[in-house]
Structure formats: C-alpha cells, structure tokens
Amino acid sequence: MSDIIYIEGREILDSRGNPTVEVEVQLSDFSYGRACVPSGASTGEYEALEMRDGDKSRYMGKGVLKAVDQVNTVIAEELDGADALDQAEIDNMLINLDGTENKSKLGANAMLGVSMAVARAAADSLGLPLYRYLGGVHAMQMPVPMANIINGGRHSDNKIDFQEYMIMPVGAPSIREGIRMTAEVFHALKDILKKEGHVTAVGDEGGFAPNIENVQALDYIMKAIEKAGYKPGKDVVIALDCASSELFDAGDRKGYKFWKSEPSKILNADEMVDLFKDWISKYPIVSIEDPLDQNDWEGYAKMTKELGNQIQIVGDDFFVTNTKRLARGIEEGACNSILIKLNQIGTVTETIDAVRMAQKAGYTAVISHRSGETEDAFIADLAVALETGQIKTGSMSRSDRIAKYNQLMRIEDELGYNARYAGMATFANLIKK
C-alpha cells in the first residue's frame, strides 16, 4: 500500500544561511521521501507566498516555524491515509486546504515541501528514480545547463545592474561533456579576472562578482570561452537574466534605472530593447530573461514580435510559473519561453501543468533553481522528467549548485545510450518559418 502514514516538517538552513522548510513523508509500505524547499532573493510580485515568522528575535524575522507547524498539524492531518501515488489529488487537497490564490494560508513553502516529499516517496514505493516516476518511459532528454558565471543585480555587491550572465554549452555531445566545458570556461574566467586584478569571490549562485561595467561582463565571458579552447556562438553561447523589475522605477522619472552603475541613467522600454538589440548584434546571446518589468505586457509583446525569431525571451517574474499568467502571455504573444520555479507556484502538479501548457503553445521551458538553495537536487530530475531541454542551476562552485549537476550526470549514466543531449536544438521551435 502507498498510503501516507507520517509527515514531519522541520526548519533547516538554505545556502544563504536563511531558514527554510524540510519535509519527510513515510508510506504504509515503508517507502520514504524527503524534500527541501528553495527560496529566492529577487521575487516576482505575483509569486505564491512564502510563510515567514516575522519574529525579529529569531533569524531576523525569517524563521519558518509557522510553516513547519502547518506541515505538522493541518497538512499532516488532512493527508493522513491519502494515496501518495496520486500526485494530482494530493496537490489538489493541498490547494483546497489552503483556499487562497497565493497560498498565503498554509504558505507555499509548507505546501511545496509536502508535495515534493510525497513525489519522492511515491517514486520510492514503485522502485523508480524520480525522473522516471514524474516523466514516464519517454523521459530521456538531458537539459543544456544555463550556468551563471558572472553575478550582478541583487545577487552581488558590485556595480553590474543585470542579475545573471550565463553560458550554455550547446556544442557538447552530452550533459557530462557540457558540464566539463562549463567548468573549463568558469576556471578560465577566474584566471582572467585574477590577472586583471579583480576579486574572484563568488555570489549567491556561485558566479563571480567582479566590480565591472555591464558590457564588460560580456567581454570577459567571450575571452574566457576562447581561453578555454571553445568557439563563442558554436560551442558555447550566452544567456542573460536582467531581472528588470528590480531596475524599474515607477516614480516621477518612470523607467529602468541603472541604480548600481549609473544612477542618473533611466531608459524606457524601447530604449531597453534597443540596448538588447545592440548586444545581440555583437555577442552570441541566445536567451534573455525578464528583459522588462513584470507588468509591461505591451512591452513584452512588442519585444517578442521584434526579437522572438532571434532569441529566447524568458518570462520569470513575468509569468511566475502561473498558468493564468502564461495563458495570457500566449494569447498576447508575450515572450516565447517560461522559467519554471517550483516555489513560485507551490506544488509539483501546478509546476508540471505550467510546463505542459508552455510546450503545447510552442514555448520553451527552463527549469530553475533559486538563489537560496539546498542540497536537494529535485529540479535535476524534474528537468529530465519534463524534457524541457534547459536547466538553470547556478555556476561551477558551491555544493548547493553542484548537487544538481552531479545528479544530472548520474541520470545520464543510468540512461546510457538512450540519453539524448538537447544542445542547440532546444531553441529550434523558436525560429519562425
């Protein structure tokens, strides 16, 4: 039997030293699952709500004992005896129990911890790896890493305004080789930065955080790709996460304020798009995430019309893994890709629904970590299960990021000759005929 007989939540720490929720689930056949919930630094306005204690005497108000209590009382009682093999029903029970649009009653962190742990317990009950349980027999595509090697924005204390400068090893034959290529570029970049007198300390997601200009970050990445022995645009391409909602100033001088590098500089949406056009013409940039503010539907539709057949335009804060917002984006032609973060929506089933909706509409989907991570590698299995072809899970440092890469290599080894690496083909459906 796969009935739930035991659920326990606890407070643990994430990679930034902030509290987060861990949940354990045991089934009547002694199967077991455990999951840890990630947390973001720059969060979208429309994300599901994390429940925090607000008690300034503990962890500066960031404790999660209230969320843990919800797991151990209300949720545990509701799910007692429920069939763990019916993930959709389990998640529906959680959604109904919460009863709010943004998961504010139970907390998305409490709900997600339970949802993920139940999925792991169910996979254990069937004797299946998590990716096979969630994805079925056809889950064999390995994702291309989107590795953050230079940090800016709210992820660092330097003067780079945009949050993430990433590389993607699209020319690799396998995930293992792609990870090797990424690591080699990462170490080449470190050598270059060190020789030019820059600090090589790393940010929240393991990338370097040198105190350089926005465009200089691209120049350094190009040099690092070449120093590692690869060809920019063929072997390795560049992706950006601008996190532009963090730059948007809705005050008297409405626009995008480059508050770290040039506080007096404010661009409107058209000028932001012109900046990206210039960069795309000079650098092998294939993907830009959150290039505009999360409420600028008109701007996103216009940018997608102009650039959507050249690059991947990814909605993160714009879509927040929410099918309602995604459906509107599809209808209005805004973006051509969605970033997928489990804790933005709060359950495994809703996450899967968002990916399937995107794929059906011809959008790509990128499975993503958060800046506050743990050793949990659930998203590695999820990326393979849903055959998204892309995963964004940090740089080649910090064990909380490396845990995901190591899990991907294990999965590829397990799949053997059946494993397929997405490579540049992951962008094929974006090219309009």
From Swiss-Prot:
<feature type="active site" description="Proton donor">
    <location>
        <position position="205"/>
    </location>
</feature>
<dbReference type="Pfam" id="PF03952">
    <property type="entry name" value="Enolase_N"/>
</dbReference>
<feature type="binding site">
    <location>
        <position position="371"/>
    </location>
    <ligand>
        <name>(2R)-2-phosphoglycerate</name>
    </ligand>
</feature>
<feature type="binding site">
    <location>
        <position position="163"/>
    </location>
    <ligand>
        <name>(2R)-2-phosphoglycerate</name>
    </ligand>
</feature>
<dbReference type="GO" id="GO:0000287">
    <property type="term" value="F:magnesium ion binding"/>
</dbReference>
<dbReference type="InterPro" id="IPR029017">
    <property type="entry name" value="Enolase-like_N"/>
</dbReference>
<feature type="binding site">
    <location>
        <position position="316"/>
    </location>
    <ligand>
        <name>Mg(2+)</name>
    </ligand>
</feature>
<keyword id="KW-0479">Metal-binding</keyword>
<feature type="binding site">
    <location>
        <position position="241"/>
    </location>
    <ligand>
        <name>Mg(2+)</name>
    </ligand>
</feature>
<dbReference type="InterPro" id="IPR020811">
    <property type="entry name" value="Enolase_N"/>
</dbReference>
<dbReference type="GO" id="GO:0005576">
    <property type="term" value="C:extracellular region"/>
</dbReference>
<keyword id="KW-0324">Glycolysis</keyword>
<dbReference type="Pfam" id="PF00113">
    <property type="entry name" value="Enolase_C"/>
</dbReference>
<dbReference type="GO" id="GO:0006096">
    <property type="term" value="P:glycolytic process"/>
</dbReference>
<keyword id="KW-0456">Lyase</keyword>
<dbReference type="InterPro" id="IPR000941">
    <property type="entry name" value="Enolase"/>
</dbReference>
<keyword id="KW-0963">Cytoplasm</keyword>
<comment type="similarity">
    <text>Belongs to the enolase family.</text>
</comment>
<comment type="function">
    <text>Catalyzes the reversible conversion of 2-phosphoglycerate (2-PG) into phosphoenolpyruvate (PEP). It is essential for the degradation of carbohydrates via glycolysis.</text>
</comment>
<dbReference type="InterPro" id="IPR036849">
    <property type="entry name" value="Enolase-like_C_sf"/>
</dbReference>
<feature type="active site" description="Proton acceptor">
    <location>
        <position position="341"/>
    </location>
</feature>
<dbReference type="InterPro" id="IPR020809">
    <property type="entry name" value="Enolase_CS"/>
</dbReference>
<dbReference type="InterPro" id="IPR020810">
    <property type="entry name" value="Enolase_C"/>
</dbReference>
<dbReference type="GO" id="GO:0009986">
    <property type="term" value="C:cell surface"/>
</dbReference>
<keyword id="KW-0964">Secreted</keyword>
<comment type="pathway">
    <text>Carbohydrate degradation; glycolysis; pyruvate from D-glyceraldehyde 3-phosphate: step 4/5.</text>
</comment>
<protein>
    <recommendedName>
        <fullName>Enolase</fullName>
        <ecNumber>4.2.1.11</ecNumber>
    </recommendedName>
</protein>
<feature type="binding site">
    <location>
        <position position="341"/>
    </location>
    <ligand>
        <name>(2R)-2-phosphoglycerate</name>
    </ligand>
</feature>
<dbReference type="GO" id="GO:0000015">
    <property type="term" value="C:phosphopyruvate hydratase complex"/>
</dbReference>
<feature type="binding site">
    <location>
        <position position="289"/>
    </location>
    <ligand>
        <name>Mg(2+)</name>
    </ligand>
</feature>
<dbReference type="GO" id="GO:0004634">
    <property type="term" value="F:phosphopyruvate hydratase activity"/>
</dbReference>
<feature type="binding site">
    <location>
        <position position="392"/>
    </location>
    <ligand>
        <name>(2R)-2-phosphoglycerate</name>
    </ligand>
</feature>
<feature type="binding site">
    <location>
        <position position="370"/>
    </location>
    <ligand>
        <name>(2R)-2-phosphoglycerate</name>
    </ligand>
</feature>
<keyword id="KW-0460">Magnesium</keyword>
